[in-house]
Amino acid sequence: MELEPTLFGIIEALAPQLLSQSHLQTFVSDVVNLLRSSTKSATQLGPLIDFYKLQSLDSPETTIMWHKIEKFLDALFGIQNTDDMVKYLSVFQSLLPSNYRAKIVQKSSGLNMENLANHEHLLSPVRAPSIYTEASFENMDRFSERRSMVSSPNRYVPSSTYSSVTLRQLSNPYYVNTIPEEDILKYVSYTLLATTSALFPFDHEQIQIPSKIPNFESGLLHLIFEAGLLYQSLGYKVEKFRMLNISPMKKALIIEISEELQNYTAFVNNLVSSGTVVSLKSLYREIYENIIRLRIYCRFTEHLEELSGDTFLIELNIFKSHGDLTIRKIATNLFNSMISLYYEYLMNWLTKGLLRATYGEFFIAENTDTNGTDDDFIYHIPIEFNQERVPAFIPKELAYKIFMIGKSYIFLEKYCKEVQWTNEFSKKYHVLYQSNSYRGISTNFFEIINDQYSEIVNHTNQILNQKFHYRDVVFALKNILLMGKSDFMDALIEKANDILATPSDSLPNYKLTRVLQEAVQLSSLRHLMNSPRNSSVINGLDARVLDLGHGSVGWDVFTLDYILYPPLSLVLNVNRPFGRKEYLRIFNFLWRFKKNNYFYQKEMLKSNDIIRSFKKIRGYNPLIRDIINKLSRISILRTQFQQFNSKMESYYLNCIIEENFKEMTRKLQRTENKSQNQFDLIRLNNGTIELNGILTPKAEVLTKSSSSKPQKHAIEKTLNIDELESVHNTFLTNILSHKLFATNTSEISVGDYSGQPYPTSLVLLLNSVYEFVKVYCNLNDIGYEIFIKMNLNDHEASNGLLGKFNTNLKEIVSQYKNFKDRLYIFRADLKNDGDEELFLLSKSLR
């Protein structure tokens, strides 16, 4: 079949009488030349058609005809090969009405019942075949108008050919090689249960859909088979975690998923056996809800291996309030299955203080250091509270009470040896929690916890105070290690004077212990030793010798310590190993004042005796008068040093230690039962006495005014063991963080004038005080030797001693001037600090 004659016949059929035969022949020839040109382009067609439009009549009918011709030729220009053009024209020719086909000499081979089965030979090679199936309409040439011309009359009168062929007859050839829907339904049930089949084999968690399934059914299968893939994924997780040693909460989650998979299997089997599924559409409609449920279960188990059970519980608790009812229902079901196990964790901790088999799924955990020893546990209970892991359905404050209940139980049972009481306590609340188990974590559960917390904390305080004398020990620490009882320190120094003057490497420990006992008997602390009830309080007192190296004397290395044993060692931080050793640091600092004061008192008495001795010499001459005057004047300088030492000691003891101790005891008094006639009073600066805080109402008033239990309105707060330790640590921290004590970089206050931290400036001043008293001691010794020589009338020796006497006088004056200069700068630093207390201290140091 030739190109030009066929094209001529088709154009003549599309636009009869549009052009004369000669013009039409010329037009077709020009078009064929363009089609055969190697540089052909559809843009060349426009000018050619415009030229021949001028040769025809201008009317609406001719415009429509030219539009049809242009549209037809546009599709033809899209074909590259001449043979393909001829095939295209042949197909197009067969679609023309029969009365026009008679005019065309060539035989038609277009779209009809005969050639539809072999339509692949007519397809254009321009478009790639469909990825779905070869028998798809998607594979027909987009450059042609076959689909549009088949589906619409295109202004032509339908011929007998169209009326005799139905749409099914036209489409049946496309489905000859496809798989019927009935056969697909026979195999789908296997795939839904993640079982491979001949039609739909599984390949590494993928389902292979045959290419002979039409596009529509293939799309439905993509949706339906999601259930099979989800079922396979969940089944794999169930089998995997059944073989592992996982926590009970995760096991409960796996059991729930396993039951859901069993229900899904039964549903699929019933669906297949019922015969209600007649198409893929109906199958998808029936299984859609199960797909949604399996999706939700897969979402919840997405990170099952990495996350802990309590994390799942927290997440499920959030989804319990989800807007989607299906998600809410599934989350609630899973939450209820896991919360019972979490309730057991709580019960074991609340009634027995046990953390066994929690698998790290609890907000309370053991914190045992692998490098630690058994001795470390006498200072702390190795249990920690992780606030970040507290679930949202338990209030943070209540979670802390839960933590303290179990910790207090361990404290009483293991450290206080209250075995009988803890057993009765455990049985009592085990019954209460067991009876509340059907309610779960509810308001009633919270009320039981509040009552249990109050009971165990009150009993803990009672045991600490009555059995282990907690408050007595606190006051003993303040009176001894913080030098609250000055008579004890004076007696101790007086008794240990000779021992402290010996070298540190030869200090006998047994003598220090004996001196310590004698000092207690001579002081106001003797009631602690003489009372059988309080003897354990004073028994913890111990004398220690610091290791400062060779050349030190007892005064430099002596210190006091207090040895605590459980349970008090857990609530009172007294020089714990690897700690800051707060009491040791404070004692050693205050020891400087006591040491200086002792030597000044000693030298003052010695100087007074020397002066009185000189006055008794016969022949009271001007030389003796001069010596007496010089000693008296030096005594005035000594008094200024001594006053500075006493003022600073008083400030440390009264304004720093005593004030912080009062604050601590006010907090500790909350744990005691006060009578209604005892009030907490404070004295203002002007001497006025006022009530500290608000006067609390009587318990009877609260009972009559409300039907609630009086315990719910308790105003006084009882401190638990952690709070007792915290109060004591705060007391020590506040002392050491004071500007005159602080040594930490973040707490140090540097003087504006000296450029030194206040404690450093003060230590230098105290060293000056001590150096002064040493020179002053030498002066007194020389003065005493002069007195002896004068009594013996050894004037030559007296003259030599007078030279030494005057040299020491000059050194004393020099040290005094140096001290006054340092004191002036120190006072300026305090005055310029901006702190009112330090400003008043600077004024008192004038």
UniProtKB/Swiss-Prot annotation:
Residue stretches spanning the membrane: none
Compartment(s) where it occurs, according to its Swiss-Prot or TrEMBL record: Nucleus; Cytoplasm, Cytoskeleton, Microtubule organizing center, Spindle pole body
Pfam family, one: GCP_N_terminal
Keywords, ordered alphabetically: Cytoplasm, Cytoskeleton, Microtubule, Nucleus, Phosphoprotein
GO MF annotation: an example: gamma-tubulin binding
Modified residues annotated as Phosphoserine in this record: S124, S136
A biological-process GO annotation: spindle assembly
GO cellular component, one term: outer plaque of spindle pole body
InterPro entries, sorted: GCP (IPR007259), GCP_C (IPR040457), GCP_C_sf (IPR042241), GCP_N (IPR041470)
More about this protein: Present with 56 molecules/cell in log phase SD medium.
Function, in words: Involved in microtubule organization by the microtubule organizing center, the spindle pole body (SPB). Probably part of the microtubule attachment site at the SPB.
Family: Belongs to the TUBGCP family.
Protein name as it appears in the record: Spindle pole body component SPC98
Species lineage: Eukaryota, Fungi, Dikarya, Ascomycota, Saccharomycotina
